From Swiss-Prot:
The lineage of its organism: Bacteria, Bacillati, Bacillota, Bacilli, Bacillales. InterPro entries: Peptidase_S1_PA, Peptidase_S1_PA_chymotrypsin, Peptidase_S1B, Peptidase_S1B_tx, Trypsin_dom, V8_his_AS. One of its GO terms (cellular component) is extracellular region. Belongs to the peptidase S1B family. It is found in: Secreted. Gene3D superfamilies: Trypsin-like serine proteases (2.40.10.10). The active site is at H75, D113, S193. Its EC number is 3.4.21.-. It comes from the Bacteria. SUPFAM superfamilies: Trypsin-like serine proteases. This is Serine protease SplC. Residues 1-36 form the signal peptide.
Length: 239
């Protein structure tokens, strides 16, 4: 049977059961089928690498690149200022908690949508007393390079409020690289801004800045980490 017909039939059944209350499990199964069609899976344990390197903001994503240092987008960091408290920690079914205070925000001087945040090492709210950021996350390493058709994964927090701030992983391939821009076909949604684009070795290639939320789209975009961008980031990693 055609897979699209199955998905449409399941979706129709899900609508019916949501009204009648017959079987809520059908709704969950339908969502799982839809996610499988997009090559998207929910991360169950965010305490293991590479998932413990991807942190949740209130409506976006970031990832750890060094001691007390997080990469995200300018359009994410513009909503914050030094001294603000953020839920910069991996989240999910086994999230480790902790709220941290921002020490500095450094935007990339070019047009590229990259921002580096440095945070206080000790949690100021939630989590055990004296909760240490670096003991509960793992920083990513830079990939040496990347090329078209390389397999990639994107990890982040799509539709965070709707998905209860759970972490998801999507997979795909690189479709093109031009200057500082990388296009890929892994499925992304609002909330994936600031997600890392990783190669098969879980090394970071770039940071997601936008997409059109369409299966198979080749126009989802990330800032590609060129030597110049890597150098900027490296200079802002806390020593």
């Amino acid at each position: 049977m055609n897979k699209n017909i199955v998905i449409k039939s399941m979706a129709a059944l899900a609508i019916l059961t949501s009204v009648t209350g017959i079987n809520a499990a059908v709704v969950e199964e339908t969502q799982q089928i839809a996610n499988a069609e997009k090559n998207v899976t929910q991360v169950k344990d965010t305490n293991i690498f590479p998932y413990n390197g991807v942190v949740s903001f209130k409506d976006a994503t970031g990832f750890v690149i060094g001691k007390n240092t997080i990469i995200t987008n300018k359009h994410v960091s513009k909503d914050y200022k030094v001294g603000d408290r953020i839920t910069a920690h991996p989240n999910g079914d086994k999230g480790n908690g902790g709220i941290y205070k921002i020490k500095s925000i450094s935007d990339y001087p070019g047009d590229e949508d990259i921002s580096v945040m440095n945070i206080e090492e000790q949690a100021v709210e939630r989590g055990p007393k004296g909760f240490n950021f670096n003991e509960n996350v793992q920083a990513f390493n830079f990939a040496k390079d990347a090329k078209v058709d390389d397999k990639i994964k994107v990890i982040g927090y799509p539709l965070p409020a709707q998905n209860s701030f759970k972490q998801f992983e999507s997979t795909g391939t690189i479709k093109r690289i031009k200057d500082n821009i990388l296009n890929f076909d892994a499925y992304i949604e609002p909330g994936n801004s600031g997600s890392p684009v990783l190669n098969s070795n879980n090394e970071v290639i770039g940071v997601v800045y936008g997409g059109i939320g369409k299966i198979g789209s080749e126009y989802n975009g990330a800032v590609y980490f060129t030597p110049q961008i890597k150098d900027f980031i490296q200079k802002h990693i806390e020593q």
